[in-house]
């Protein structure tokens, strides 16, 4: 076999372009000496990376040292192909002083300057923090991203709206079809106007933009139709200038923002499984006069009232540690958040939103920022987006007074543009609840991470003459451009998962309500009646309290949550017969079920409780060491009395 003919490869770096003659059978690490000859003298060899696209633009970047055993012909490179090179420069230190290359000395003499002409201090030259930079793209998200089962189900649906025969316009038989009776697309404007649907559902919007982005008749390559708004400075600009805030160009700076009402919503409806969920949250306000916040746990289900719709079904509300105030709440660190999420997962639930009282309504500016921050924490995974995620299904509900003086529920989401503007630190709440402020651009001379780039922001509105005009959003603009309203309600046929929610709610000690073993014993100790236990565990707050005790193992806790959500007698009997449940019952009988006969001070009562077994004349003596269950019961007993 004849040896492979040499080929010419082109290389491009921020220092310029060069060409190398190589053999197709050469391995990439063998090219390192030739590559270094064409790069600056102070280039760090371990930092050299190769890419099929300009560095920082989403290409397949690989360190050249990791390509050992990979030949040029193996990756499909042919004569004339181009590769892009990224590298870092190193500074030699001699006797405690920096020995710089002449080119770097000239750069220090010509210090980088901002757009306004102000020189950048050297200590500012640090990589920007991850927050104000753009998101990374995912190659083939339709293969790499795992969606929720509900999204997969809605993707497989046809979604078209069937119509009957129009007796006025149709001129065909019952088996025919024409333009007046053919099924409509789920985003058909005439159907939305007829049903008074203000926003498209997410999957209807997806069908609409996918039909215009990917046309099968063109036989072109597939392009993900969804792209999240990006208002942050791009990292690793291919132009080769210093990173922001030292430098910026048209390739890495975000474009101007034009705000418009979002035509779709990620979730269409919020359904509370029972009015008791709302009443229990309002009870705190009635008893304390302060506001309250809770996180919603439930599921996402198909909402049939709108084409391809999604609804959030709330089954429980968990109130994290907080301090209520007359006009708001202050959240404390939620130490057991992961444990509560795990209990919810065992019950088939997830965190789907937040609800808070706002009975002294001061406006919506700070609430929108709060909602946007939470939605940014819980993004929606989708294979239809180039970043693998798009928007969020997290909802926000507010309990406030209406015009008639009654308490009403408002459900909304922050728009995708609002979430991105909060992440990019572009907007902030104002003293006027009806408007949002655009922040001032900041060039920090003390900390590069505090530098803030603010693009131009506009919004469109209909003026007094009926014309659609564009207005400058600086210094402020109406908050309506950042909101998407949702519908809400209660089911006509309630299907309540936790049908025995009488256990005290967590973190309510300030109004005299606390969770303890005695309350737990009243609900769970059955005295031979297993149905009491099976019914008693159907309480989300009780499940979280049991999780905090750490008595049951994970398998027993999963079985407990199964009984709580399914109310199945067979599973309940299996739970009662587990060793962990026997330990729990022993603890409750020893510590929580029987109140003390005398009212002792706490310290002396604890002392007597911990020693009376050994000193009581009628106490039975065991010849064997005490079991772990008995020892654990005594420890709980001594700690819980009082």
Swiss-Prot record:
- Note whether Membrane occurs among the keywords: yes
Q: Where is the composition biased (Low complexity)?
A: 97-108
Family annotation (PROSITE patterns)? MPN
Record field: compositional bias (Polar residues) = 601-611
What are the protein's GO molecular function terms? ubiquitin binding; ubiquitin protein ligase binding
Composition bias of kind Basic and acidic residues appears in 621-633
Q: Which Gene Ontology terms describe the biological processes this protein takes part in?
A: mRNA transport; protein transport; ubiquitin-dependent protein catabolic process
The domain of life for this entry's organism is Eukaryota
Q: How does it sit in the membrane?
A: Peripheral membrane protein
What is its subcellular localisation? Cytoplasm, Perinuclear region; Endoplasmic reticulum membrane; Nucleus membrane
MPN domain location is 270-418
Record key words, sorted: Cytoplasm, Endoplasmic reticulum, Membrane, mRNA transport, Nucleus, Protein transport, Translocation, Transport
Q: Which PANTHER family match?
A: NUCLEAR PROTEIN LOCALIZATION 4, NUCLEAR PROTEIN LOCALIZATION PROTEIN 4 HOMOLOG
* Its job: Involved in the import of nuclear-targeted proteins into the nucleus and the export of poly(A) RNA out of the nucleus. Has a role in the endoplasmic reticulum-associated degradation (ERAD) pathway.
Name listed for the protein in its UniProt record: Nuclear protein localization protein 4
Gene source species:
Ajellomyces capsulatus (strain NAm1 / WU24)
Q: What is the lineage of its organism?
A: Eukaryota, Fungi, Dikarya, Ascomycota, Pezizomycotina
């Amino acid at each position: 076999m004849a040896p492979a003919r040499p080929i010419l490869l082109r290389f491009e770096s921020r220092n310029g372009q060069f060409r190398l003659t190589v053999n197709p059978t050469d391995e990439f690490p063998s090219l390192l000496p030739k590559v270094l000859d064409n790069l600056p003298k102070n280039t760090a060899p371990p930092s050299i990376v190769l890419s099929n696209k300009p560095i920082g633009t989403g290409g397949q970047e690989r360190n050249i040292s990791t390509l050992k055993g990979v030949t040029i012909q193996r990756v499909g490179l042919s004569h004339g192909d181009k590769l892009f090179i990224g590298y870092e420069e190193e500074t030699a230190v001699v006797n405690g002083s920096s020995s710089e290359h002449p080119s770097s000395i000239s750069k220090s003499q010509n210090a980088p300057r901002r757009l306004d002409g102000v020189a950048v201090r050297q200590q500012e030259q640090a990589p920007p923090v991850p927050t104000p930079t753009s998101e990374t793209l995912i190659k083939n998200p339709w293969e790499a991203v795992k969606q929720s089962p509900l999204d997969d189900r809605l993707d497989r649906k046809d979604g078209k709206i069937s119509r009957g025969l129009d007796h006025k316009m149709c001129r065909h038989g019952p088996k025919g079809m024409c333009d007046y009776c053919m099924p409509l697309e789920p985003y058909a404007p005439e159907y939305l106007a007829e049903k008074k649907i203000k926003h498209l559902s997410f999957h209807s919007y997806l069908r609409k933009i996918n039909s215009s982005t990917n046309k099968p008749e063109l036989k072109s390559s597939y392009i993900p139709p969804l792209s999240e708004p990006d208002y942050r400075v791009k990292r690793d600009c291919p132009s080769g200038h210093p990173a922001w805030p030292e430098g910026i160009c048209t390739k890495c700076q975000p474009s101007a923002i034009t705000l418009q009402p979002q035509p779709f919503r990620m979730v269409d409806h919020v359904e509370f499984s029972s009015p008791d969920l709302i009443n229990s949250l309002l009870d705190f306000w009635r008893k304390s006069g302060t506001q309250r916040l809770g996180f919603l746990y439930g599921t996402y289900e198909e909402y049939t009232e709108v084409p391809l719709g999604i609804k959030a079904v709330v089954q429980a509300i968990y109130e994290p540690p907080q301090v209520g105030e007359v006009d708001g709440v202050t959240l404390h660190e939620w130490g057991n958040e992961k444990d509560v999420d795990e209990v919810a997962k065992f019950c088939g639930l997830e965190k789907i939103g937040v609800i808070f009282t706002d009975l002294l309504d001061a406006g919506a500016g700070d609430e929108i920022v709060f909602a946007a921050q939470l939605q940014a924490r819980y993004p929606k995974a989708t294979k239809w987006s180039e970043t693998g995620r798009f928007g969020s299904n997290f909802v926000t509900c507010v309990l406030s007074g209406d015009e008639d003086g009654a308490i009403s529920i408002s459900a909304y989401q922050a728009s995708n543009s609002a979430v991105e503007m909060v992440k990019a630190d572009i907007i902030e709440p104002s003293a006027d609840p009806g408007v949002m402020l655009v922040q001032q651009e900041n060039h920090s001379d003390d900390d590069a991470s505090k530098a803030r780039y603010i693009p131009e922001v506009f919004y469109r509105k209909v003026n007094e003459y009926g014309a659609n005009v564009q207005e400058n959003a600086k210094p402020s603009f109406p908050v309506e451009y950042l909101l998407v309203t949702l519908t809400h309600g209660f089911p006509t046929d309630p299907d309540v998962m936790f049908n025995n929610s009488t256990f005290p709610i967590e973190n309510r000690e300030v109004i005299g309500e606390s969770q303890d073993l005695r309350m737990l014993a009243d609900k769970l100790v059955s005295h031979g009646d297993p149905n009491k236990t099976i019914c008693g565990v159907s309480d989300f707050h009780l499940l979280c309290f049991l999780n905090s005790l750490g008595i049951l193992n994970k398998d027993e806790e999963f079985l407990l949550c199964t009984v709580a959500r399914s109310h199945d007698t067979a599973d309940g009997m299996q739970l009662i017969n587990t060793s962990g449940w026997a330990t729990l019952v022993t603890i409750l009988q020893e510590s929580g079920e029987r109140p003390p006969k005398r009212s002792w001070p706490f310290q002396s009562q604890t002392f007597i409780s911990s020693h009376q077994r050994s000193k009581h004349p009628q106490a039975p003596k065991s010849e064997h060491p005490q079991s772990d269950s008995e020892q654990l019961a005594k420890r709980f007993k001594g700690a819980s009395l009082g």
